Regions:
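Preference for long, amphipathic alpha-helical scaffolds in soluble/luminal domains
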Residues: 2-422
């Protein structure tokens, strides 16, 4: 799933996150030979860049929908893990692991999927171990180890730690925790008021101001709110997300207080307030802006914003985005044939406690037949809804019609006889 939004910052990191066509940044690179879709994998498109990503999202979403995936689907994901614990985006059957192809995004979502499935503790522990080993010295994570960290990858890694019940505050390099790494990318009180709480994709090596990024903000927000996939969405707050509290007097500008990192305690609410404002201003969706191209709806960022707001207990602020995705999401999912997009839409619907039957049915159809399915999860997706009378409603109506007809005939006959005797 390639996008120009992230290719400019870290070649393939965005490829797993947006579901859009490849951007011009790869125009000079020879196109790889499309990989054959292996048995057990959800979706029919080339898995080279998103195989582990879409499989992990599909397994997570279906498990939350009480669908027990086929052994081949689970086995494909576990078989992609390398001996050191990391996952690549995709590894052809029989191919050796290459540490240079392992990435934090694939590893993070695979860990969350296996936690959701249950029964894969050894693989989860190895995945968490890989994340710990490949954390940057500033506490962040890069898409590929050895590169500068970014907010999306750091947020996904923190999601995986939460899923594995590993406190991110205790996962550190050189004294910098995962929360410290996440804070590197969040705009604080030194930023303009309408940008506070947002996340930048990466920091400026020259020390310049952080630039808000829609996808980075949306994905980092789930981590800042203490969440992971799947989002339960059971906590409800009465108030809107609390914006970052800043002293805006002129004397405070440029002070150490205004330039201080956003604390972890305030981080989730601050980015939630930013996302809620952006959604309200953008017609209930976030926007992808790429240099040289017209702005377009950012389906991925909108979905992750809805997940984050649901996680932080603000379903009212997420509702508009959930509704928008319900109306427009088929464009993103290509009518339910894109496994990664369909799985993400299902995760959003689950977090918002919306009807999930159709999406569950679509996603189930994109992979191997499941071992077991909760009938209530897919009933409306596979057959017309039955009446509350247990399915005999049409026969009851026919019977009533016949009785009325017979009764009417008798009355007419009696009336004729009565007229004859008068």
């Amino acid at each position: 799933m390639l996008t120009a939004a992230r290719l400019g910052a870290a070649a393939l990191s965005a490829a797993l996150l947006t579901g859009l066509a490849a951007g011009p940044a790869l125009a000079d690179s020879p196109a790889p030979t499309p990989a054959a879709v292996p048995d057990g994998l959800y979706g029919k498109s080339d898995p080279t860049y998103d195989g582990v990503w879409r499989q992990s999202l599909a397994l997570t979403a279906l498990t939350a929908a009480k669908v027990t995936p086929a052994d081949s689907a689970v086995g494909w994901l576990t078989g992609q893990q390398c001996e050191d614990g990391g996952w690549p985006s995709y590894r052809a059957a029989g191919a050796a692991c290459d540490p240079k192809t392992e990435d934090s995004n694939a590893t993070a979502v695979a860990v969350q999927a296996l936690v959701a499935l249950g029964g894969h503790q050894e693989a989860v522990d190895k995945g968490v171990g890989w994340l710990k080993a490949n954390q940057n010295a500033d506490g962040s994570w890069a898409y590929n180890p050895g590169s500068p960290g970014d907010a999306d990858s750091t947020g996904l890694a923190v999601n995986a730690l939460f899923a594995a019940k590993t406190d991110p505050a205790g996962v550190a390099k050189a004294g910098r925790s995962a929360f410290d790494g996440l804070a590197l990318f969040q705009l604080g009180c030194a930023a303009p008021a309408d940008q506070r709480g947002a996340f930048a994709y990466q920091t400026d090596p020259a020390g310049g101001a952080l630039t808000p990024n829609a996808l980075a903000s949306a994905q980092a927000a789930l981590a800042a709110s203490g969440g992971h996939l799947p989002v339960a969405g059971t906590v409800h707050a009465d108030a809107a997300p609390k914006a970052l509290a800043c002293a805006d007097a002129p004397a405070a500008q440029g002070s150490s207080a205004s330039s201080a990192p956003v604390s972890h305690a305030e981080s989730g609410e601050a980015v939630g307030a930013y996302l809620a404002a952006q959604l309200a201003a953008g017609g209930d969706h976030l926007t992808l802006t790429t240099p040289g191209a017209a702005p377009t709806p950012d389906y991925t960022a909108t979905a992750w914003a809805a997940l984050a707001l649901s996680q932080s207990g603000h379903p009212q602020q997420a509702a508009g985005a959930v509704d928008w995705l319900g109306k427009e999401g088929a464009t993103w999912s290509k009518g339910g044939t894109d496994a990664g997009a369909t799985a993400t839409l299902l995760l959003v619907a689950q977090a918002a406690h919306r009807d999930t039957a159709a999406l569950t049915g679509q996603l189930t159809a994109l992979g191997p037949a499941p071992k077991a399915t909760d009938a209530s999860a897919t009933a409306t997706a596979t057959a017309p809804a039955k009446k509350k009378d247990g399915g005999i409603g049409q026969y009851w109506l026919i019977g009533v019609g016949l009785l009325i007809g017979v009764g009417g005939g008798l009355l007419l006959s009696l009336q004729r006889k009565r007229n004859t005797h008068l």
